[in-house]
Amino acid sequence: MLKVNYQRLDCPECPNGYNKGETVEWKVGYELTGIPSARNNKPAEDGGDVNGWQVKSPKASLTGRDNCDGYIFGFADANFFYQMSKEEFESFIEEFSYIDRDSRTGRQKVRIKSDSKKMREWLQARA
């Protein structure tokens, strides 16, 4: 099982006024199905939306992020970002579940199980 690190990519051109390029860890877990919007910075239980997520592995990250023109999905390592379709992205996710909140930050933690063999094969085919 891998932990999901929720992140937001901010953009000054957007009406929300966030800082471009600033990456902020999200405050609450959210389902990986569908494409959430970037309306605000409220936790999901308060009507907010997650607008970025990242599935970390030892060598690379399976990433979904908002580039202000809509979502792009891909597989990133230290040097490259390989774009993929939403369907390909979701095909790597085998299991998703919420776990308890972080006692220090109060943030909701989530846990996912991903198909690491499939992730490696996908990346190797494009490297």
Stretch-by-stretch model annotation:
Residues 1-127:
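Nucleic-acid endonuclease domains
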